[in-house]
Amino acid sequence: MLVRTPDGCRYDVTDPRLAGELGTGLRVMRLDRGAFDAMPVSVISDSTVSALCTLARVPGNELRFRPNVVVTLDSGVPFEEDEWVGSAVRIGAAVVRMDRRDSRCIIVNVDPASGLPGSRLLQVVGSARRACAGVYGTTVLPGLIRVGDPVVIERRPQD
């Protein structure tokens, strides 16, 4: 699998230069079972991650949810991103249409550090949130997103 960086370089996903290029703690994890996302963009707030992980009594780690974007909300209110469904949201230079809540699967039970299953996080998400946490979106305007970029709701759905 090839990854294309924002400046156009291409790397095999296992190439150690990819982590150096991205400047983050990138880690590739091989799972025995396949996993996929239903939409191109997955957004979750750190407040949502914290609330659900606290309920499940597991360390608060957004990697369990495999999002493309983690946002810090000024309000600190968990699940606020649910209200964005139907909205156009600017994240950095990109605009994303928030299409629907993100239905979670068993992979949230996998410890991102060890790759081993073992938590009851999905059970908590299922009972507390109808198995949804975060939102799925579609890119309307491609653009660069950087850590710390503002998140602005540009258009809300009409009531």
Predicted feature locations:
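Metal-cofactor-dependent catalytic cores
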Residues: 1-159
